[in-house]
Amino acid sequence: MAKIKARDLRGKKKEELLKQLEDLKVELSQLRVAKVTGGAASKLSKIRVVRKSIARVLTVINQTQKENLRKFYKGKKYKPLDLRPKKTRAMRRRLNKHEENLKTKKQQRKERLYPLRKFAVKA
């Protein structure tokens, strides 16, 4: 089997990807048997290509799965931890923009009663 390109895999359905993954795994096991029995050098060099192809297929499957989960949870109140933005612990606990801008009744009253003074400069 020739080297598989990730862009070709992205258009395929999940069932097709799983079938291709199964085929690659079977091929890899055959190549490993050939390695033990003393197969040709061309087969031995093919092991690396097949392993990388398996990794590509699995990567595409995982990426599409995660993308679908992101779409599903978009706009929902709670998201799984692995879909939330990875920030530092302190940043996650920080007040959000709305909470930072909230003012107490006393503070609002004080600002209303004593607004900032505007001074005119005499030229």
UniProtKB/Swiss-Prot annotation:
Gene Ontology CC: one annotated term: cytosolic large ribosomal subunit
MF terms (GO), sorted A to Z: mRNA binding; structural constituent of ribosome
Family matches, as Gene3D superfamilies: 1.10.287.310, 6.10.250.3450
Protein name according to UniProt: Large ribosomal subunit protein uL29
Cross-link (Glycyl lysine isopeptide (Lys-Gly) (interchain with G-Cter in SUMO2)): 25
Subcellular location: Cytoplasm
Binding partners and assembly: Component of the large ribosomal subunit.
Subcellular location, principal: cytoplasm
The organism's place on the tree of life at top rank: Eukaryota
Family indicated by similarity: Belongs to the universal ribosomal protein uL29 family.
SUPFAM superfamilies: Ribosomal protein L29 (L29p)
Signal peptide, first to last residue: none
Lineage: Eukaryota, Metazoa, Chordata, Craniata, Vertebrata
GO process terms (BP): maturation of LSU-rRNA from tricistronic rRNA transcript (SSU-rRNA, 5.8S rRNA, LSU-rRNA); translation
N6-acetyllysine carried by residues: 19, 43
Annotated keywords: Acetylation, Cytoplasm, Isopeptide bond, Phosphoprotein, Ribonucleoprotein, Ribosomal protein, Ubl conjugation
Post-translational modification Phosphoserine, affected residues: 29
Organism: Sus scrofa
Any Pfam family matching the protein: Ribosomal_L29
Purpose of the protein: Component of the large ribosomal subunit. The ribosome is a large ribonucleoprotein complex responsible for the synthesis of proteins in the cell.
